[in-house]
Amino acid sequence: MIPAEFYKYIYLILITIITLFVVKQRNDLNLCEGIGKNVWFCVFLILFIGFRPHSPIFGDMMNYANWWRFSSWNGWDWNTENKIFDNIYGFMGSVFPDATPFFVLIAAIYFIAILIACRKLFPSNTFIVYLVYLAAFSTLSYATNGIKAGAA
């Protein structure tokens, strides 16, 4: 497993190298590109971020991991502050012994939603725009630290 303190650097180096490669290979910006490589890269990001080690380096993640399985699940609770998030967290905490599947789900929501937005707004340059988004806008910190804010 990759040590938590290296995740940020590996992420930024990976995004930079892929961006340079894609920009160098891309000749015609008006051609509508296929979605295949975008989906594969999105799946890679979901797995890379979702299966990260539980570490204080990732901020809020440790709070969610430490409170895992302490809440009991008695069905959907309409009285919670954040109805969807809190109920999913409680349900998954009662089903899975570890918080990792929850982090994978949150990463999937985060990265798939961004990919869909990039595809809708920029159908001919989806991959480049997706890479620019991933390199900018505090993407890594929202995906790992502000779990609720990142998915929202």
Each language-model region and where it sits:
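Short hydrophobic/aromatic helix or loop-helix immediately within or flanking a transmembrane segment
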Residues: 60-97
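Hydrophobic core segments of transmembrane alpha-helices in multi-pass, intramembrane catalytic enzymes
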Residues: 8-16, 66, 106-111, 133, ...
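Transmembrane-helix motifs of polytopic, lipid-linked glycan transferases
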Residues: 105-123
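Extracytoplasmic loop-helix module adjacent to an early transmembrane segment
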Residues: 35-42, 50-74
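Membrane-embedded helix bundles of polyisoprenyl
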Residues: 127-146, 150-151
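Start-transfer (signal-anchor) and selected internal transmembrane alpha helices
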Residues: 1-45
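Transmembrane-helix signature of polytopic, membrane-embedded enzymes
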Residues: 33-35, 118-136
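Structural signal for the C-terminal ends of transmembrane alpha-helices
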Residues: 17-30, 50-53, 116-122
